[in-house]
Design a protein with these regions (language model features):
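Active-site helix of classical SDR
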Residues: 114, 151, 159
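Short C-terminal tail/terminal secondary-structure segment
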Residues: 2, 139, 216, 239-251
Length: 251
C-alpha cells in the first residue's frame, strides 16, 4: 500500500465481483474513500468502504443515491463505470430486446452516471472518469459478440467525447479495454457456449485460453492495476484514450 488514492472519493459500480471488485479492493488498499455499488447488495460485502445497492439503469435511483453520497462525501474525485453485460451471438441472434438491454446497461448506464456525478467534479475543477470497455469486437473483431462489441465501441466513443468536452475544466476520461479475463462473467459465457455447442466446459474453456497470445487468461487484478493508474494523479497527462490490458490479443 502506497496511498496512491489517499483521501480521494472514488465510486465503483458493479463492485460485487470480477473486475469491479478487484478495482474496489485496489482503490481501498490505496487509501481511497471508497463507495462500492452493485445491483445485488450482498455481493460487495467484505469490501472496505461505503457499500450500497444501485441499479445503474434507473435514473431516479441514481439521483437519490447521488444526493445521499454528496451529503456524506461531497463531490467525487474518481468515477469507475464497470457495470456491463455480455450477449452471446451474431446479428441474427440479437432481438430488439437483446439490443435494448445491452445498450441500456453497457452504454446508457455510463451516460447516466457521468451526467449525474460530473457536475460535482466540475465544481472541484478536477476528476478522473474510468469506463470499462473491452478489447473484444470494439478493438478486434471476435465471433458472436455482435451487440456486445457495438456497445463497447460506443463506450470508447463516449469516453473520447467526455474527454474532449471537459479537458479545459480539469476532467480526465479514459477507457480500459480488457481482453479475456478470469471472472464470473467469463464463466457465464463458457457455460452459454457449452450449452449451445454441446461441448464440455473444459473444451470450451481451452478454446478461450488458446486464443490468448500469452497462453493464459488475464486476472481481474491486472485490470485493476491499470484502473488504479488512470484514477490516480500519476496519469494526470492522460485523457481520452482506450487503454488495452489484453495480453496481446489485439496485436
Amino acid at each position: 500500500m502506497s496511498g496512491r488514492l489517499e483521501g480521494k472519493v472514488a465510486l465503483v459500480t458493479a463492485a460485487g465481483q470480477g473486475i469491479g471488485r478487484a478495482i474496489a479492493e485496489k482503490f481501498a488498499a490505496e487509501g481511497a474513500r471508497l463507495i462500492a455499488t452493485d445491483l445485488d447488495p450482498n455481493k460487495p460485502q467484505g469490501l472496505r468502504g461505503k457499500l450500497r445497492k444501485l441499479d445503474v439503469r434507473a435514473q431516479d435511483d441514481i439521483e437519490a443515491f447521488a444526493r445521499d453520497i454528496s451529503r456524506e462525501f461531497g463531490p467525487l474525485d474518481v468515477l469507475v463505470n464497470c457495470a456491463g453485460y455480455v450477449h452471446q451471438g451474431t446479428v441474427l441472434d440479437c432481438a430488439d430486446k437483446d439490443w435494448d438491454f445491452s445498450v441500456d446497461l453497457n452504454v446508457k448506464s455510463m451516460h447516466r452516471m457521468i451526467m449525474t456525478f460530473l457536475p460535482g467534479m466540475l465544481e472541484k475543477k478536477k476528476g478522473s472518469i474510468v469506463n470499462i470497455a473491452s478489447a473484444v469486437s470494439s478493438i478486434r473483431g471476435v465471433p458472436n459478440r455482435y451487440v456486445y462489441g457495438a456497445t463497447k465501441a460506443a463506450v470508447i466513443g463516449l469516453t473520447k467525447a467526455v474527454a474532449a468536452d471537459f479537458i479545459k475544466q480539469g476532467i480526465r476520461c479514459n477507457a480500459v479495454c480488457p481482453g479475456t479475463i478470469e471472472s464470473p462473467s467469463l464463466g457465464d459465457r463458457i457455460n452459454a457456449v457449452s450449452q449451445e455447442s454441446g461441448r464440455s466446459l473444459d473444451l470450451v474453456r481451452q478454446d478461450f485460453v488458446a486464443r490468448q497470445p500469452m497462453g493464459r487468461l488475464g486476472t481481474p487484478e491486472e485490470v485493476a492495476w491499470l484502473a488504479l493508474f488512470l484514477a490516480s494523479d500519476e496519469s494526470g497527462y492522460i485523457t481520452g484514450h482506450a487503454h488495452l490490458v489484453d495480453g496481446g490479443m489485439a496485436l
